[in-house]
């Protein structure tokens, strides 16, 4: 593509950055991202697996963006082609994985929260996703749990217990989205995707959970990135217009 800024890539989180939490991208935002891609190389890095990212960004997501990094980049695509995949089970081993899962399920069983549904642990290629309420909850229940969690700190308390119990495994526990947190080996956070971007001296990252403990924190703080905190998809678009589209128009 002509007209792109050389040596520069812009990376985006999904939930809360390109879409409302667990919602599909709006046609307006999708059109904006395609316009942005005309002037900069664009990548997406999400904690979810490719199936869930596709539900939010569309079935053609791996060809709609130059890079798509699912599961923090543990499953990586460039120009629609798979370029890398990492495996949590092979890294940790079956016995340690089983110990972690058993303890987590016991903890959730003893947890006194207003409602519980199903799928409390989701096993992904590069991580575990743990949800105290269960991923089968409705959107309304998801919204209610998010409010409840902000008051009672269910996830952060659970993370503190797991972090202490399994400190010998060198795992990272990262809170993201409305109802869950991710568990993965140290270094397998969103900075993992940066190993595929050695050709880009300038890397911008846009995310909403850039605070310590949030799943955008490490890549936001990385020396290799210029971090931008956003509050919504509209805010993302406005900041991008300011940083890239206005700059491109000024250079024209």
From Swiss-Prot:
Gene3D superfamilies under this entry? Answer: 3.30.1240.20, HAD superfamily/HAD-like
Recorded catalytic activity of this chain's protein: alpha-D-mannose 1-phosphate = D-mannose 6-phosphate
Name what cofactor the protein needs: Mg(2+)
Name the GO cellular-component terms. Answer: cytosol
- Compartment list: Cytoplasm
| Residues that hold alpha-D-mannose 1-phosphate according to the record | 22, 124, 135, 142, 180, 182
Look up the record and name the pathway of this protein: Nucleotide-sugar biosynthesis; GDP-alpha-D-mannose biosynthesis; alpha-D-mannose 1-phosphate from D-fructose 6-phosphate: step 2/2
Where does the record place the catalytic residues? 13, 15
* Positions that bind Mg(2+) 1: 13, 15, 208
Which InterPro entries does this chain map to? HAD-like_sf (IPR036412), HAD-SF_hydro_IIB (IPR006379), HAD_sf (IPR023214), PMM (IPR005002), PMM_cap (IPR043169)
Q: Which residues bind Mg(2+) 2?
A: 220, 225
The conditions that induce or repress this protein are given as: Induced by abscisic acid (ABA), salicylate (SA), cold stress, osmotic stress and salt stress.
Q: Name one GO molecular function term.
A: metal ion binding
EC number in record: 5.4.2.8
Enumerate the UniProt keywords alphabetically: Cytoplasm, Isomerase, Magnesium, Metal-binding
A GO BP entry = mannose metabolic process
Q: Name one Pfam family in it.
A: PMM
**What is the reported tissue distribution?**
Expressed in roots, leaves, stems and flowers.
Family named by the database record: Belongs to the eukaryotic PMM family.
Assembly, per entry: Homodimer.
By its UniProt entry, which PANTHER family does this protein fall under? PHOSPHOMANNOMUTASE
Q: What does this protein do?
A: Catalyzes the interconversion of mannose-6-phosphate to mannose-1-phosphate, the precursor for the synthesis of GDP-mannose. GDP-mannose is an essential sugar nucleotide for the synthesis of D-mannose-containing cell wall polysaccharides (galactomannans and glucomannans), glycolipids, glycoproteins and the antioxidant L-ascorbate. Involved in the biosynthesis of ascorbate and polysaccharides in response to abiotic stress during seed germination.
Additional comment: Overexpression of Dendrobium officinale PMM in Arabidopsis increases total leaf ascorbate and polysaccharide content, and increases seed germination rate under osmotic and salt stresses.
Q: What is this protein called?
A: Phosphomannomutase
Instruction: Name the source organism.
Output: Dendrobium officinale (Orchid)
In the record, what lineage is assigned to the organism producing the protein? Answer: Eukaryota, Viridiplantae, Streptophyta, Embryophyta, Tracheophyta
